[in-house]
């Protein structure tokens, strides 16, 4: 099965933060599924659009997008919606059998719904 997985704050074990979506995606890959993760690259000073990497068999699409809790409320909203729009375009151009979206933020539902509609595939929304 081809899975398009959306998680704005995806981390690998080498990164600080939760790795639940990594563990789920890795398990799916180990079971023979294809997983394309759409996420953000929050590395400071790393700008330039999208980059792609292979993380233990998970094809990860990283969008350079500045974000921190120190941003103003408006700037955080802009970051959430920038990711929603960019990931909608990215995911809509991929091939998949299902779209799986993990919140937070809840705005992850926007690209998930768009990709599901555009590709006519089911959606799983994990809160």
Regions found by a protein language model. Give the residues of each.
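Short, well-ordered beta-to-alpha junction loops that form the rim of enzyme active sites
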Residues: 8, 102-105
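An amphipathic, basic-hydrophobic alpha-helix
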Residues: 62-99, 107-120, 125
């Amino acid at each position: 099965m081809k899975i398009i997985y959306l998680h704005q704050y995806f981390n690998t074990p080498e990164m600080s933060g939760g790795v639940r979506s990594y563990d789920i995606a890795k398990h799916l890959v180990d079971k023979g599924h294809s997983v394309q993760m759409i996420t953000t690259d929050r590395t400071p000073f790393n700008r330039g659009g999208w980059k792609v990497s292979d993380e233990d068999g998970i094809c990860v699409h990283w969008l350079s997008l500045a974000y921190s809790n120190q941003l103003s409320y408006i700037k955080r909203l802009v970051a959430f919606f920038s990711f929603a729009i960019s990931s909608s375009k990215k995911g809509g151009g991929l091939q998949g059998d299902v779209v799986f979206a993990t919140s937070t933020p809840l705005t992850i539902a926007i690209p998930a719904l768009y990709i599901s509609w555009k590709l006519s595939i089911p959606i799983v929304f994990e809160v």
